[in-house]
Amino acid sequence: MSQLSTIIEQAFEDRANFTAADCPSEIRQAVEEAIAGLDNGTLRVAEKINGEWVVHQWLKKAVLLSFKLNDNKPIESCDLRFYDKVETKFSGWTEEQFKAAGVRVVPPAVARRGSFQAKNVVLMPSYVNIGAYVDEGTMVDTWATVGSCAQIGKNVHLSGGVGIGGVLEPLQANPTIIEDNCFIGARSEIVEGVIVEEGSVISMGVYIGQSTRIYDRETGEIHYGRVPAGSVVVPGNLPSADGKYSLYAAIIVKKVDAQTRAKTSLNDLLRAD
């Protein structure tokens, strides 16, 4: 792996010195190997090691290089035609491949090659971008978007119209991460590398970026870029120091309890084989 990452890192530094037409075969092969690893889940842009999230920046660079090395080409889906550099993940898959993967894909859901969906993932008509990792038992509901290189944990529910930010444009240092057993309410947006820690519930219509104040009404503490584990978060406002106006904030109203869990529990019937 160190050799692969070294090739990618060096190629990214030298990217102005070659084109898709004259790219050295070693670089092209390394990029393809990295994308294939992201696609089958053996590689991840970010992973939790000893309780801390570690970002493998070289894999993000591999994704960016793949855009440089591949030309646009027609992509067909029934009567629809597209023109892009990245193939769709499930193009040409057989019934046996879908059964082996254990993923349910509802038309017209789209996942790009280089993204990974683990067993018992359900993709309603949604979009999963390259480099994203969606772990076991998660549902990506209708019109939800999982951005490039985003990391979605086990047994997560991304409700209708949810947006999970990517890293490619505007260029972000770290991916957005939704940890295990989280519930993200309809039309909420989590972006800019924010981490929603395990077991949290985000209400409908909550918008969180790195500069969003996340206010804990019980302790008075303000967090940035991180929703503490087990939080229940709703949209709100905080007053200015002079009391003349208020600005948007995400408010932690309580910790998850049995009542919250009952309202946001996952339905195993929807994930049965």
Swiss-Prot record:
It catalyses: (S)-2,3,4,5-tetrahydrodipicolinate + succinyl-CoA + H2O = (S)-2-succinylamino-6-oxoheptanedioate + CoA. The keyword Ion transport does not apply. It holds the Pfam family THDPS_N_2. Keywords: Acyltransferase, Amino-acid biosynthesis, Cytoplasm, Diaminopimelate biosynthesis, Lysine biosynthesis, Repeat, Transferase. InterPro entries: DapD_Trfase_Hexpep_rpt_fam, Hexapep, Hexapep_transf_CS, THP_succinylTrfase_dom1, THP_succinylTrfase_N_sf, Trimer_LpxA-like_sf. Its EC number is 2.3.1.117. CDD domains: LbH_THP_succinylT. It is found in: Cytoplasm. Substrate binds at R104, D141. Pathway: Amino-acid biosynthesis; L-lysine biosynthesis via DAP pathway; LL-2,6-diaminopimelate from (S)-tetrahydrodipicolinate (succinylase route): step 1/3. GO terms for biological process: diaminopimelate biosynthetic process; lysine biosynthetic process via diaminopimelate. GO terms for cellular component: cytoplasm. Its main location: cytoplasm. The keyword Cytoplasm applies. Gene3D superfamilies: Hexapeptide repeat proteins, Tetrahydrodipicolinate-N-succinyltransferase, N-terminal domain. It comes from the Bacteria. One of its GO terms (molecular function) is 2,3,4,5-tetrahydropyridine-2,6-dicarboxylate N-succinyltransferase activity. HAMAP family: DapD (MF_00811). Belongs to the transferase hexapeptide repeat family. This is 2,3,4,5-tetrahydropyridine-2,6-dicarboxylate N-succinyltransferase. It comes from Acinetobacter baumannii.
